Amino acid sequence: MGRTSDARERLMQTIVELMWTGSYGSVTIDDICEKANVKRGSFYYFFESKADLALAALDQEWQRHRQELDSMFSPTVPPLERLRKHCEYVYKVQSEWKARTGHVLGCALFALGAEISTQEPKLSKKIQDILDQKRKYLESAIRDAHAAGLINAPDAAAKARTLFTYCEGQLTEARIQNNLDIVHEAIHGTCELLGIPEPVVAG
């Protein structure tokens, strides 16, 4: 079974990967236990259901990702640099997963949210909360860039919503078409929406 001490962690890591590379509905508890090398009885020691595991896993993954965003979007980083770093980060992550799995995976939260929005209200609420927090990082950078006279965006919240929705839509299309070029197009579109120079990323 592997060490009981890290079984809970392995279960959470496993469901995140299986949901992202596949779907929430197609993944069974047996699938999760097999890939995580954890016995089914141990699963129920830690979690009451697949939904409970997914909630815990999303929360943990968000805490980890939030640390990366805190660094990327630190107020000590110039606002346009924050946005460029984020563009580069998104492309890098999608490129790495394409190399690893053969597929562009897009945004795990959007894919999962679209799938379970009418079926798992607690999961749906968690996803909405995380997406709202992610959008706030863009909003803060846009607000600071406008205040510095670097872009014209007097309504930072509205601009952030537009930008966030555009980028997530592009990532979803990239997943559907399995085309990394669409992720790069999202970077170009982001820069056009903000009126800033496009960062150079590896193709």
What are these regions (language model features)?
Residues 105-111, 154-173, 189-192:
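Hydrophobic alpha-helical segments that form the core
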Residues 98-122:
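Amphipathic alpha-helical segments used for helix-helix packing
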Residues 81, 85, 104, 120-146:
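Amphipathic alpha-helical packing segments from all-alpha helical-bundle domains
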Residues 93-97, 118-119, 144, 164-181, ...:
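Amphipathic C-terminal alpha-helical segment
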Residues 10, 18-60:
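Helix-turn-helix
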Residues 1-6, 152, 200-203:
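N-terminal intrinsically disordered/low-complexity leader segments
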Residues 56, 70-105, 160-163:
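Hydrophobic alpha-helical connector segments
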